[in-house]
């Protein structure tokens, strides 16, 4: 795939038409338009329906990527917080719709975001269409000259097998099955090859929902500094998993399965404990640069390990502790390292 593909289109995103899914949550129509720079009439369109948790996951993924780009001149857009009460009110639905639309439009001028695998995955399953061509076809097609009899018309029995087969093909539209050409069309719209802007960032797959708010600077609650017992809590988390808060990631919105088979303590917890223990020692000794790196490494290990953790309760605990460690790392950067030369 050519690296120039990322410059071939102008992108335009809209989020509209909120509706209630049969399962009870709200979903939004997301439309991505790709307008060719060479031919403005060459417009491709992808439409998908997404819920709040999908947008929130994408926000966390893109926030992580944006932070690694070190683009300090632009502020990554905020996203509405999850809430238990009032999430079906018109004002909340509109706030979420606008937040999702602002997020997508923010990516337009940043190649590392608008060509990211996370954004491509977000639109996976949507059909790539050419709305202008469909509109032109509607004007040039002549009206049918002979009315088609209904399917239960007794005259159908008098048709020859070949005629019946041809008539049924006209009456029953056949949806094209997922095919490689459709996937290739999506690949052409989202050029996921590495760009110069993102070349310094380590390669990683899309974040899971468990990683959602941890790298999102707008999703952490303000509060007191982390407790000095963080490491002890992390080391004993497998014992306390039954007592951890198990509130759902999107309150009242998703169906989660509980897994009671925890098994032995995951290795990633032990590794993260060692890293964060050393980070606490470095911070106490005034070695703030080493402490900052230690917290970041510890959080990275937690986020890599938590998706495969068999205990949902422990996953929630890991997410909360990782958020605290990341917040502590940001405090060290702000209080002790912000004045250092680049």
From Swiss-Prot:
<keyword id="KW-0653">Protein transport</keyword>
<feature type="modified residue" description="Phosphoserine">
    <location>
        <position position="227"/>
    </location>
</feature>
<keyword id="KW-0446">Lipid-binding</keyword>
<dbReference type="Pfam" id="PF04212">
    <property type="entry name" value="MIT"/>
</dbReference>
<feature type="region of interest" description="Disordered">
    <location>
        <begin position="245"/>
        <end position="267"/>
    </location>
</feature>
<dbReference type="GO" id="GO:0006886">
    <property type="term" value="P:intracellular protein transport"/>
</dbReference>
<feature type="modified residue" description="Phosphoserine">
    <location>
        <position position="201"/>
    </location>
</feature>
<dbReference type="Pfam" id="PF00787">
    <property type="entry name" value="PX"/>
</dbReference>
<protein>
    <recommendedName>
        <fullName>Sorting nexin-15</fullName>
    </recommendedName>
</protein>
<dbReference type="InterPro" id="IPR051866">
    <property type="entry name" value="Intracell_Sig-Traffick_Protein"/>
</dbReference>
<feature type="domain" description="PX">
    <location>
        <begin position="1"/>
        <end position="130"/>
    </location>
</feature>
<dbReference type="GO" id="GO:0043231">
    <property type="term" value="C:intracellular membrane-bounded organelle"/>
</dbReference>
<feature type="binding site">
    <location>
        <position position="96"/>
    </location>
    <ligand>
        <name>a 1,2-diacyl-sn-glycero-3-phospho-(1D-myo-inositol-3-phosphate)</name>
    </ligand>
</feature>
<dbReference type="InterPro" id="IPR001683">
    <property type="entry name" value="PX_dom"/>
</dbReference>
<dbReference type="GO" id="GO:0016020">
    <property type="term" value="C:membrane"/>
</dbReference>
<comment type="function">
    <text>May be involved in several stages of intracellular trafficking. Overexpression of SNX15 disrupts the normal trafficking of proteins from the plasma membrane to recycling endosomes or the TGN.</text>
</comment>
<keyword id="KW-0597">Phosphoprotein</keyword>
<keyword id="KW-0968">Cytoplasmic vesicle</keyword>
<keyword id="KW-0963">Cytoplasm</keyword>
<dbReference type="InterPro" id="IPR036871">
    <property type="entry name" value="PX_dom_sf"/>
</dbReference>
<feature type="binding site">
    <location>
        <position position="53"/>
    </location>
    <ligand>
        <name>a 1,2-diacyl-sn-glycero-3-phospho-(1D-myo-inositol-3-phosphate)</name>
    </ligand>
</feature>
<dbReference type="GO" id="GO:0030659">
    <property type="term" value="C:cytoplasmic vesicle membrane"/>
</dbReference>
<dbReference type="InterPro" id="IPR007330">
    <property type="entry name" value="MIT_dom"/>
</dbReference>
<dbReference type="GO" id="GO:0005829">
    <property type="term" value="C:cytosol"/>
</dbReference>
<dbReference type="GO" id="GO:0005886">
    <property type="term" value="C:plasma membrane"/>
</dbReference>
<comment type="similarity">
    <text>Belongs to the sorting nexin family.</text>
</comment>
<keyword id="KW-0472">Membrane</keyword>
<feature type="binding site">
    <location>
        <position position="51"/>
    </location>
    <ligand>
        <name>a 1,2-diacyl-sn-glycero-3-phospho-(1D-myo-inositol-3-phosphate)</name>
    </ligand>
</feature>
<dbReference type="GO" id="GO:0035091">
    <property type="term" value="F:phosphatidylinositol binding"/>
</dbReference>
<dbReference type="InterPro" id="IPR036181">
    <property type="entry name" value="MIT_dom_sf"/>
</dbReference>
<dbReference type="GO" id="GO:0005730">
    <property type="term" value="C:nucleolus"/>
</dbReference>
<feature type="binding site">
    <location>
        <position position="87"/>
    </location>
    <ligand>
        <name>a 1,2-diacyl-sn-glycero-3-phospho-(1D-myo-inositol-3-phosphate)</name>
    </ligand>
</feature>
<feature type="domain" description="MIT">
    <location>
        <begin position="265"/>
        <end position="342"/>
    </location>
</feature>
<keyword id="KW-0488">Methylation</keyword>
<comment type="subunit">
    <text>Homodimer. Interacts with SNX1, SNX2 and SNX4.</text>
</comment>
<keyword id="KW-0813">Transport</keyword>
<feature type="modified residue" description="Omega-N-methylarginine">
    <location>
        <position position="105"/>
    </location>
</feature>
